[in-house]
A protein has these predicted regions:
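Non-catalytic terminal/accessory segments
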Residues: 1-541
């Protein structure tokens, strides 16, 4: 096979092939820290006997710091900024492996995970045998019950009426090779900038099989993915990524931020490269054929079918795993190797799905990395968005230097719905303030205004209950230290919308407090979701 990373000289066919029959069970061991040493060839480039795509599962030591997540519960938010040793086995951990979908893995899948952890070059055969009727049933119940139907028009409730018989038939078709993937139903959803984003809705049976296959493949790739990678992974949600970025900038000597955006990432994933990357770990030809069926099933829009030669539908169950695998080889491993080989100063990396932020101490490193990154993406059919990719001066030392020069404060950048601002604590120390992005807030208010208009025919109690749940959901994500003013802005806007709603129902002239119950005011002020520190006054809506 062709050289995938430019530094690797080992093809998938040279790796060991492992057969897994699910005959044993192992405990939940974490990934060891040790990584493979890099050697230098005559040209001065890093070379490794093992491909750097098989680097041992060491978390990114400059990115993922030890800080309790705002929403993470009792678990630690991320690994330490410095070198760290993971607990090899924790007695409090359950024997069964937790997955992104919360589906319990079988004993055989525990063996797959154990083998993937111990041997980074192993290629797995007979993986499709782990797609059992039990796993398909669990995958069916893990799907959203109110999700929109695909091209087949099948809903979850209709399939559930005779799901046992249908699951058995689906299982037989998968293992006979007669299963056929259906095209995705394309719909369009609005983006914050006013443009439309294509969304692919898979047929129900395709969702079930994709969910089951994702559970199987997660056992392998969760042992390969690096600590800098977040998004659509067990225990690595948005708040953990935000905390990792916060601690990385706060504790490291960061003076420059590269806020990068990949143009149309899901629509431009190269199928050939993706399959080559998958073959580094998968030797099961039946499973590879199944993955090809989903990639090349095409899309259906307004009753017209069109082939898909590139990209994966955004919204498909398997697409997040595809994206993480693709960027693991194209971006993550390459960035870590570039940092060790070419960087002069410290570099931090945090990636959430296709959205990533890089922090640099030296400006020369930032400019060199940006140029090398453009070349790297071109090789694999990707492109950085020229208008949304920015290199800005940001961080503790950036703020100090700009203050000495008499310049304006450092620019801000948005990441995962929050605007990051260089600020100071009450004691005068440097800190990073994070507030809800104003575009997100305005978009949410507009969305609720339109939805309230559609619910004019409903009774007030039903609408009030819905509005209260929407506000609670917003607070559960956006209630972080320093974001109190943004939450209050949304609360005030929703109260105004609710007041107008009551007036349209014949309550003209009455005060909101004396009219129908206020669903926003019914939320207690001492709600845990609103226990956040005060921030500087935010922008008005």
């Amino acid at each position: 096979m062709s050289n995938v990373k430019g530094e690797s000289d080992v093809s998938p066919t040279e790796s060991k092939t492992t057969r897994t029959d699910g005959s044993f069970s192992r405990g939940n061991w974490e990934i060891p820290e040790t990584s493979l040493p890099l050697e230098m060839d005559r040209s001065g480039k890093a070379r490794c006997h093992h491909p750097d795509m098989h680097v041992a599962g060491k978390s990114d030591s400059l990115v993922v710091p030890a800080k309790q997540a705002n929403k993470a519960g009792p678990q630690t938010a991320a690994e330490s900024v410095e070198e760290r040793r993971l607990t090899k086995e924790n007695a409090s951990q359950p024997l069964l492996v937790r997955t992104q979908s919360r589906v319990i893995k079988s004993r055989g899948l525990l063996g797959v995970r154990e083998t993937a952890r111990k041997d980074k070059k192993a290629r797995f055969n007979n993986l499709l045998n782990h797609v059992t009727t039990e796993l398909l049933q669990a995958s069916f119940f893990d799907l959203k019950k109110n999700a929109a139907p695909g091209i087949d028009g099948e809903t979850w409730s209709a399939y559930a009426e005779d799901f046992e018989t249908r699951i058995i038939d689906l299982h037989n078709r998968i293992h006979r090779g007669s299963y056929r993937a259906k095209p995705s139903k394309r719909t369009w959803i609005p983006k914050l900038d006013g443009k439309l984003r294509p969304l692919g809705i898979a047929a129900l049976e395709d969702k079930i099989v994709q969910q089951a296959v994702r559970v199987v493949l997660e056992c392998i790739y969760e042992e390969d993915f690096l600590g800098l990678s977040y998004g659509f992974r067990p225990g690595r949600d948005c708040h953990r990524a935000l905390d990792a970025l916060y601690m990385g900038i706060s504790r490291q000597k960061v003076s420059w931020i590269l806020d990068a955006d990949i143009r149309g990432f899901f629509d431009n994933i190269n199928h050939d490269w993706l399959l080559k990357f998958l073959e580094h770990r998968i030797a099961d030809r039946r499973l590879l054929r199944l993955l090809k069926k989903w990639l090349r099933a095409g899309v259906s829009e307004d009753g017209k079918w069109s082939p898909s030669t590139v990209g994966t539908p955004q919204g498909a169950v398997i697409s997040p795993l595809f994206s993480n695998v693709f960027l693991h080889y194209v971006l993550d491993l390459w960035l870590v190797a570039w940092r060790k080989r070419d960087a002069v100063g410290q570099v931090i990396i945090v990636r959430y799905a296709d959205d990533f932020v890089l922090g640099f101490r030296e400006e020369i490193d930032a400019k060199r990395c940006l140029g090398a990154l453009k070349e790297r993406f071109t090789k694999f059919g990707l492109e950085l968005h020229p208008e949304k990719t920015r290199l800005i001066e940001f961080g503790r030392y950036a703020a100090e230097r700009r203050s000495r020069r008499g310049d304006t404060p450092p620019e801000t950048f948005d990441f995962l719905g929050f605007t990051h601002i260089c600020g100071k604590t009450r004691k005068g120390d440097f800190t990073i303030k994070r507030i809800s992005a104003i575009k997100k807030l305005r978009s949410k208010v507009k969305e609720l205004k339109d939805e309230l208009r559609k619910r004019m025919h409903m009774d007030l109690a039903t609408v009030g209950s819905w509005l209260r749940s929407v506000y609670r959901g917003w607070c559960q994500y956006h209630a972080i230290p320093g974001n109190y003013d943004r939450l209050q802005q949304l609360r005030t806007a929703l109260q105004e919308l609710w007041f107008r709603r009551l007036r349209r129902r014949g309550q003209r002239g009455r005060r909101l407090e004396t009219a129908e119950p206020n669903p926003i005011k019914m939320i207690r002020q001492d709600d845990k979701s609103q226990q956040v520190d005060p921030a500087r006054p935010g922008q008005s809506l």
